[in-house]
């Protein structure tokens, strides 16, 4: 079997520094997994110099390799500039789903006692984003229009992934669109969720309108949840869910593309935070989300060795925090590299023990 190749999409400011920390953890010498890396410079300077051609090259590599990890990048404010690479990357790799999971971080107090993980499966295309918009009329007679669309194919992709993922993690599928008001438009998504529920009768399914989903989140603290959502709903809902756990540091963002059988074929992971320019060069930023992005990526390598490495990273990262080794944003005193060093030490130790027990 050939060695997995990961496309590394470099970024800006502290975002790049944290990617470097994640790559230290993904070192084959640490995780005992042979990997190849292909690097692409998506810094603002290089995107401008190449007129975004490097983004196209990076997307082609992610598609070819099936695996990619991306640092946070600067989005310039001038609309005539190169813009954000994120939407372009999602389009070029045919990303259909964005998965974000809120989870408890040791020593960080969540809101309202929320305990079990909550994953938001967000539609990555269609809906309100990318819709054509225009206005007609003048004064108080001016009217704005939007041409949103939902295709059954994309709705089925999101629904299928939602139930497969919920089955894998032992969670309940919870929530849904506002189909009672938008019977035709949002109703197509509800139809596909119901159909997926019928295909996976072993997965608990509690359909709710999106507004009820928000309201009931704080009352469902004991069950792990997977919440399917339309593009714009998922954008706002995932931000809320991550903050419910007290910090976005414990979450990674996973962009997924599927084949015609709804199996995952392309994965691009990243941290949900920005470039944090005020922290650049200070060695104080929290690398946890970026490290978890690397761990999440390994889950899709589909080998036992990769699964063990992924688990070791997740456990090592959280156990270090539980033992008081954490950066200042979580109430600790560890520097960025010190925390990463501790994660590496624990990952190596876990893999040593697990290998010994397998012998």
Q: What are the roles of these predicted feature ranges?
A:
Residues 47-145, 232, 236:
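N-terminal glycine-rich phosphate/adenylate-binding segment common to multiple enzyme folds
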Residues 32-56, 217:
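N-terminal beta-loop-helix "entrance" segment that forms/cooperates
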Residues 303-358:
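Internal helix-turn-beta structural module
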Residues 12-15, 66, 121, 162, ...:
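Buried hydrophobic positions in well-ordered alpha/beta secondary-structure cores of metabolic enzymes
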Residues 46, 217-323:
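Glycine-rich phosphate/nucleotide-binding loop
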Residues 5-14, 68-72, 172-179, 295-299, ...:
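Short glycine-rich or small-residue beta-strand-to-loop segments that form or flank ligand, phosphate
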Residues 7-24, 28-30, 138-209, 223:
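Glycine-rich phosphate/diphosphate-binding loop of Rossmann-like nucleotide-binding domains
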Residues 45, 208-215:
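Short acidic loop-to-helix transition motifs that present clustered carboxylates
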């Amino acid at each position: 079997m050939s060695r997995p190749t990961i496309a590394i999409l470099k970024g800006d400011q502290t975002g790049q520094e944290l990617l470097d920390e994640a790559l230290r953890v993904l070192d084959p010498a640490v995780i005992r997994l042979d990997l190849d890396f292909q690097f692409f410079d998506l810094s603002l300077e290089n995107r401008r110099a190449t007129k975004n051609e490097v983004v196209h090259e990076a997307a082609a590599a992610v598609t070819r390799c099936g695996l990619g990890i991306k640092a946070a990048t600067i989005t310039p404010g001038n609309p005539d500039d190169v813009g954000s690479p994120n939407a372009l990357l999602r389009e070029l790799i045919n990303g259909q789903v964005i998965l974000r999971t809120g989870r408890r971080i040791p020593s960080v107090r969540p809101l309202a006692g929320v305990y079990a993980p909550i994953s938001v499966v967000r539609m990555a295309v269609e809906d309100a984003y990318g819709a054509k918009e225009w206005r007609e009329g003048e004064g108080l007679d001016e009217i704005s229009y939007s041409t949103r669309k939902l295709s059954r194919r994309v709705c089925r992709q999101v629904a299928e992934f939602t139930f497969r993922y919920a089955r894998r993690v032992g969670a309940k599928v919870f929530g849904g669109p506002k189909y009672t008001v938008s019977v035709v438009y949002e109703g197509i998504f509800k139809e596909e969720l119901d159909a997926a529920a019928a295909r996976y009768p072993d997965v608990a399914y509690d359909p709710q309108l999106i507004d009820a989903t928000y309201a009931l989140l704080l009352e469902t603290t004991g069950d792990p949840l997977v919440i399917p959502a339309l593009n714009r709903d998922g954008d706002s809902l995932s931000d809320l869910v991550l903050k419910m756990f007290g910090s976005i540091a414990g979450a990674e963002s996973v962009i997924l593309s599927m084949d015609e059988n709804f199996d995952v074929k392309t994965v691009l992971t990243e941290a949900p935070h920005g470039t944090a320019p005020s922290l650049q060069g200070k060695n104080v930023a929290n690398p946890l989300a970026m490290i978890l992005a690397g761990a999440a990526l390994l889950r899709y390598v589909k080998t036992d060795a990769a699964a063990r490495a992924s688990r070791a990273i997740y456990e090592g990262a959280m156990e270090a925090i539980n033992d008081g080794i954490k950066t200042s944003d979580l109430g600790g005193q560890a520097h960025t590299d010190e925390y990463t060093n501790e994660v590496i030490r624990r990952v190596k130790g876990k893999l040593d023990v697990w290998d010994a027990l397998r012998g």
